[in-house]
Amino acid sequence: MKQTVYTASPESQQIHVWRLEPQGTLTLLQVVDAPGQVQPMVISPDKRFLYVGVRPEFRVIAYRIAAHDGTLSEAGEAPLPGSPTHISTDHTGRFLFSGSYNAGSVSVVRLNDGLPGETVTVVEGLEGCHSANISPDNRTLWVPALKQDRICLFTLTDDGHLEPQTPAEVTTVAGAGPRHMVFHPSKPFAYCVNELNSSVDVWALSDPHGNIECVQTLDMMPADFSDTRWAADIHITPDGRHLYACDRTASVITVFTVSEDGSVLAVQGHQPTETQPRGFNIDNSGQYLIAAGQKSHHIAVYGIEGEQGLLAEKGRYAVGQGPMWVVINAFDA
């Protein structure tokens, strides 16, 4: 398995393409000058395309991924109805979802053989919409509306429309601000990081299309932290044993262990990281975590070590200005 890392730096309008070496170092392969401020990114399920949300002309650009080394070439684009804050796809690669914080909406774009096409549907009224997350069974789209302290639940139809589920939403505590989410790789649980109070909620999905319950909320900040809370991103290892979330004010990554059944998180430590970590990701082997410092203009690579999953820095690398997003692709070559 070979792995390629992509970092998006909107201030310099660049995508950096790196090879992740087996020992955890990065080798720069390519710098792509993008036609705008590149922010959210996602890799297609078949690993052939990298999709990038661009501002100020709101659109999604598809870059074709070279099979031999992961480098990029532009393949197509489509307009978006709002400024893209977060993008993702369904598991079949037929639809792309774009959440827009400023527009308070989520849109669905049809993908035609991997290339973005027409917008199928737009759902508005989602104040502070910060992500769109398809469930493991590809049926339910979870859409956190940060300003409304709720996560809206939609059924994805075969033609790409979104229909409110019953219940149509789950709510957090007041002032939490749900932002990004991940699903356990094999157990019926979801985890959501809350931006405004820097906490993580555990949602039990015993009946993922009906009875959804928050079974745990954990403070992710160090005990002596007293500044403004400003959480950003969350990811889980491929084996489901460790979960990580970052806070931008404290510039830390919080390390959690996950119980065997997925229902309980436990804080193991707080890793100081790059200044204002806006985004990070975990490689496909579960050995490395790569974090982007929006104010340090660097990325840092950490080894994930031991039963606790604590982080050990392996190196840091200058990227473009204001890096915000990290995605990692694995391929056979």
Curated annotation (Swiss-Prot):
| Cited Pfam families | Lactonase
**Which top-level group of life is the source organism from?**
Bacteria
Q: Which reaction does it catalyse?
A: 6-phospho-D-glucono-1,5-lactone + H2O = 6-phospho-D-gluconate + H(+)
Query: What cellular-component terms does GO give this entry?
Result: cytosol
**Gene that specifies this protein:** pgl
Q: Name one GO molecular function term.
A: 6-phosphogluconolactonase activity
* Family stated for the protein in its record: Belongs to the cycloisomerase 2 family.
Which residue stretches, if any, does this entry annotate as coiled coil?
Answer: none
Q: What is this protein called?
A: 6-phosphogluconolactonase
**Does Hydrolase show up as a keyword for this record?**
yes
Q: Which UniProt keywords apply?
A: Carbohydrate metabolism, Glucose metabolism, Hydrolase
Function, please?
Catalyzes the hydrolysis of 6-phosphogluconolactone to 6-phosphogluconate.
Its EC number(s): 3.1.1.31
User: Which pathway?
Assistant: Carbohydrate degradation; pentose phosphate pathway; D-ribulose 5-phosphate from D-glucose 6-phosphate (oxidative stage): step 2/3
Q: Which Gene3D superfamilies match?
A: YVTN repeat-like/Quinoprotein amine dehydrogenase (2.130.10.10)
What GO biological process term is on the record, naming one?
A: glucose metabolic process
Q: What top-level class of enzyme does the UniProt entry assign?
A: hydrolase
Name the InterPro entries for this protein: 6-phosphogluconolactonase_YbhE (IPR022528), Cycloisomerase_2 (IPR050282), Lactonase_7-beta_prop (IPR019405), N2O_reductase_N (IPR011045), WD40/YVTN_repeat-like_dom_sf (IPR015943)
Question: Does the record's keyword annotation contain Oxidoreductase?
Answer: no
